[in-house]
Each structure stands twice: as C-alpha cells, then as structure tokens.
Amino acid sequence: FASLKSKQHSDMLMNLSEGQDNRVRRAIWNALRNYKNNNDVSTFLQNVVSTDSKYYSVSDAFRALVAVDTAAAGKKVEALLVRDSHQDVIRSAAISFFGSVKSDKNYNRLKELASYGGTTWDARPEAVSQLSKYAKEKSETVDIFVNLLEDRSRDVRRRAIYALASHGDKTHLGHLDEVMFKDPALGRDIRYAKKRILNPPKKPTKTPVEKKLEEANRKLDEIKRLLD
C-alpha cells in the first residue's frame, strides 16, 4: 500500500476525492503522479484539468498528468498556456511540461518563454526554473542564466541565481557579486548560490527507487493528516 502502485489503490484515491475540500483533493492529485501509464488515472486527471473551477487544483492535476501520461498532457498544454489564473499558477504548470518532457523542441520553447516578453510576468520565472533541467546536457543554458541576472524581473533574476547555484562555477561569482551590488534584496539568495558553488553538495546516496518510494509515502502521510 505504501508505494501506491496497485490499481486498487488508485481507484481508492480517485473515489476519496469526492466531496473533499481543495487541500485534500490537491494532495490526492499529487499522490496520483505515481500511477504512470495508468489509463484510468490519466482520464480522471484530464477531466479535472478540463472541468475543475479551482485554479490550484487544475495546476496540480496537470502536473500530475504530465507524470502519468505525457501524451495526454501535451494535448492540453497550449490551451493552459493562455489560461489566466491567480498568480498564473495554471500557466506555470503548463510551462513545467517543457522541462519535464525533454526535447530540443521543448528546450527552444522554454528559451522563448524565459525571454523578456516571452510570456506573462508571473509565469516567466517558471520557464527559467524549467530551463535549468537542461543545463547538464546543454551547457549553453548557463549563459542564458548569466544574461538573466540583468533581467527587469526580480523573480526571474532570483531563479537565475538558483540555477547558477546548481550549474554554475567559480567563473560566475563575479556576476553574482555584481547583482548583489545592484540589488541587495537578493543578498540571501546570492550568498546561498556562492556557498553552493564553492562547496558543492555531495551526491545523494539514495537510489531513484528509494527516493520515489519515500516521496510516495510522504504524499500518503500528507493525505492522512488532511483527513484527520
């Protein structure tokens, strides 16, 4: 039960969502991410995305759909990119598709979305974060982050700083110092990035399977707490 893998448990989760408040339903959508290639879960999540009136519920359901059925998610992404919502949570969820489903086409789309005017003010930071998923195989992405340190949006600059924290090196410390001088409000983020560059974290010892199981258990515990 803990790994949330059997069809019985997916049915239980979907049925459990009936009549629940939005917090519980969103926790269930997140738990359903574990049912990759499950047609029933895919159909269920597609229906939530298409019919739910709650912005955050739609956002979480779509992110879960990306994990469960990328083809189905791909058919909905364009419509969600033009759908307005509180703090642009739906548009941001749609943008996450291009980082979760890696391809040259999706990489180029993210570069467009991350550029100034590429999408709305609130959604652009998500495009920057998703671009960071390509940084290892496309080294030129790091240069994009450096250029974004001069962006007009502080949130975009902040995401670029965090991207450099993970993918930058000592040659980028000067760029970070320059941002610190121009915008001291980002000082905490810059100090974190510099510390991580100078002292990179050790690689995790947990296997992908162990991490996935741990995440599934965490989501189940969250649902139980919300229902108590």
Question: Which residue stretches match the model-derived regions?
Answer:
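Structural detector for internal amphipathic alpha-helices that build alpha-solenoid repeat scaffolds
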Residues: 1-6, 14-18, 23-37, 47, ...
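Core helices of alpha-solenoid repeat scaffolds
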Residues: 10, 38-42, 74, 107, ...
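Pro/Ala/Gly-rich low-complexity, hydrophilic intrinsically disordered segments
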Residues: 187, 191-228
